[in-house]
Amino acid sequence: MLHRLLPLLLVLTVLIFVSLNFQSIRRDLVYKLGISGDPTTSCCKLEEISQSGDFDETATTAIFNGREVSYPKTSLAYGFLQSLTKTPSGEEGNILGTTNDAGEEKWIEISLDDQKVRAWEGSRIVMEFPISSGKWAPTPKGTFNIWYKTRSQTMSGGSKEHGTYYFLPNVTSNMFFHQGYALHGAYWHNNFGQPMSHGCVNAPLNYAAQIFEWAGPVLPPGVNALRASADNPGTRVYVH
């Protein structure tokens, strides 16, 4: 008798699972098919990139995937995060830019398969940490250079209908390597090692702060936003 009921129980189990996870399944499907209607393909449009890089003391709410999340609400908390910053060698500020003291190139590898960032000096890895790359839109592959950096940045986008809407003030340690795509700190989740973003590369706050200071262009003291130049070039970024 029981074996006759097994097919029915299996069908009921599947139906219950689908009903409980309908929103998530539907969301994944429409994004995979490219019919979500969500135009967001990076963390920022070019015109939304901060010109000052200053911390926004007036921000009161942060939203990720349609839900409010907590975040460092004052520049004092932001300053604490910056105090964690050290170069991979543990020394402060003497191996900055696109080469180290030995003249070796400093470059950043972003592995989408491994969901990891590796900071290299020549052929030596000096830092490695998990990241979250694009889930709802792909992270672009190729060889780039950091063209702009901001210490703090508001990011918004996604779809309220599909539950991917985000409004994230005071995102830290932003390194824009291709148009509005950036490697940056993420305070709104701790799921590093899994794709989570609309194309940008999320990193743990402490690692993002370290690599931000390690990479070029170098921001002088008191400067919170800077474009790379011939005299202050951006670090090479290889995404694969």
Question: Residue ranges of each PLM-predicted region?
Answer:
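N-terminal, intrinsically disordered, polar/charged segments of Gram-positive cell-envelope systems
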Residues: 26-99
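Gly/Pro-biased beta-strand-loop elements
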Residues: 79-191
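Weak global preference for isoleucine
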Residues: 16, 25, 35, 49, ...
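Exported/periplasmic cell-wall-interacting domains
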Residues: 2-53, 139, 150, 157-240
